[in-house]
């Protein structure tokens, strides 16, 4: 549901079918309801899937696998057709709160593939250049503990970060968000179906 994946969707021919994770569709529709009526209408007809449950389009078998990313309900896809196996990684991270999922996916569900298609946003970054999500949350928790008022600015769809802040909130502090943010959080909490210690 990040706009780098949805931003041009309304320019696609309407007869082209759209497939999304169930939770991604719900969150994207909330965002589109506030920002883009045409995108909202396009999302209404989207087909949905769940992680681990393969589906077919014609002779192509697609198995979505839930992966760690700042957007909850992000997927890698194992695509099988004409005797070949392709892994499309989508966006993923190894520094998030569910980073351990990647090795399990590769060893248990993916195995060997004929073709790897991956995004290259961080390929040139040195391994030591990133800060883990756990470190970010620890730093935020320290500021919250020490400060009277702390304002956290992040994407309203960075669910892991927001839920991590909420779970680490000192007992004498309160997390306040607007109605839009609460609606997104409630949607995630009520619709997530995979393992997460956050929601």
Give residue ranges: language-model regions.
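His/Asp/Glu-rich metal-coordinating catalytic cores
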Residues: 4-160, 164
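Residues at alpha-helix termini
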Residues: 35, 171-172, 191
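Beta-strand->loop->alpha-helix junctions that form or flank phosphate-binding loops
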Residues: 46-50, 175, 181
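Short, electropositive alpha-helical surface patch
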Residues: 137-140, 169-176
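Short hydrophobic beta-strand segments
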Residues: 149-154, 173-179
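Composition- and surface-driven signal marking solvent-exposed, interaction-prone regions
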Residues: 164-168, 179-180
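A contiguous, basic/glycine-rich beta-loop/short-helix subdomain that forms a polymer-engagement track
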Residues: 180-199
């Amino acid at each position: 549901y990040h706009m780098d994946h949805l931003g041009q969707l309304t320019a696609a021919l309407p007869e082209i079918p759209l497939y999304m994770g169930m939770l991604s569709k719900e969150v994207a529709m909330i965002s589109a309801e506030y920002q883009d009526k045409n995108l909202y209408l396009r999302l209404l007809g989207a087909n949905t899937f769940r992680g681990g449950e393969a589906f077919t389009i014609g002779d192509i078998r697609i198995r979505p696998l839930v992966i760690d990313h700042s957007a909850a309900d992000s997927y890698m896809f194992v695509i099988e057709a004409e005797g070949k196996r392709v892994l499309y990684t989508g966006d993923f991270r190894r520094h998030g709160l569910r980073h351990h999922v990647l090795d399990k996916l590769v060893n248990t569900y993916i195995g060997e593939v004929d073709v790897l298609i991956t995004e290259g946003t961080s390929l040139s970054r040195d391994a030591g250049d990133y800060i883990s999500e756990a470190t970010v949350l620890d730093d935020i928790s320290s500021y919250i503990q020490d400060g009277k008022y702390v304002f956290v600015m992040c994407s309203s769809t960075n669910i892991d970060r927001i839920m991590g802040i909420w779970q680490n909130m000192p007992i004498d502090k309160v997390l306040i968000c607007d109605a839009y943010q609460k609606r997104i959080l409630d949607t995630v909490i009520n619709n997530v179906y995979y393992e997460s210690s956050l929601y």
